[in-house]
């Protein structure tokens, strides 16, 4: 998933955290999903 700057302006860190937690939970690997998604965005 690629988000542009305008999307980020309208999303709070709490919302992003919820997305990461939900995605990681659905994948059955919470911590790995969270770390992977954050690392992808920060690259």
UniProtKB/Swiss-Prot annotation:
EC numbers for this chain: 3.1.-.-
Localization, UniProt: Mitochondrion
InterPro entries per UniProt: Homing_endonucl (IPR027434), LAGLIDADG_dom (IPR004860)
Note: Encoded within intron 2 (LRI2) of mitochondrial large subunit ribosomal RNA.
GO cellular component, one term: mitochondrion
Protein name in UniProt: Probable intron-encoded DNA endonuclease 2
Organism per entry: Mycosarcoma maydis
Pfam name, any one: LAGLIDADG_2
GO molecular function, one term: endonuclease activity
Main subcellular localisation: mitochondrion
Gene Ontology biological process terms in this record: intron homing
Major enzyme class: hydrolase
Alphabetized UniProt keyword annotations: Endonuclease, Hydrolase, Intron homing, Mitochondrion, Nuclease
Family as reported in the entry's similarity comment: Belongs to the LAGLIDADG endonuclease family.
